Amino acid sequence: MIKSSAKHNDFGLTPDLTPLLDIIFIVMVFLLLTASVRLESLEVALPTTDSPVVNEVNKESITVNILATEPYWAIDGKPYLDWHNFSLALLESVQVDKRPVVIAADQGAEVQQLVKLLSFLQENGIQATQLLTEPSHS
């Protein structure tokens, strides 16, 4: 007996998804390329006060200085060569003296140094009561 081989139709009723996957991949690549847009920033002026009279720094406070050049850190006018020594000294000063912290940053100091200090103060539950500014000369 002669048998004919039956053709198996694998396609059936299921659609071919390859073109759909190609389109999804192309759209995904397009979105990834357009999502990496460079952030634009505006030039900003440093804050000043409008008040001609600036309150004197409370002598009963710990003054933390952020300097423009190395060493970047100082406590009550005493500079520290690195962040580790400064942070240990600041923690000790705050725990021993229980005085409020005043931050005095040099106008030419990097913002990154201020952000680092504020992050450290927040992590250790230290509240800075004042940020020193200078009066505007307009």
Swiss-Prot record:
Residues 1-16 are cytoplasmic. It is found in: Cell inner membrane. Keywords: Cell inner membrane, Cell membrane, Membrane, Protein transport, Transmembrane, Transmembrane helix, Transport. It is a single-pass type II membrane protein. It holds the Pfam family ExbD. GO terms for cellular component: plasma membrane. Its main location: membrane. The chain crosses the membrane at residues 17-37. GO terms for biological process: protein transport. GO terms for molecular function: transmembrane transporter activity. Residues 38-138 are periplasmic. InterPro entries: ExbD. Involved in the TonB-dependent energy-dependent transport of various receptor-bound substrates. Belongs to the ExbD/TolR family. The accessory proteins ExbB and ExbD seem to form a complex with TonB. This is Biopolymer transport protein exbD1. It comes from Vibrio cholerae serotype O1 (strain ATCC 39315 / El Tor Inaba N16961).
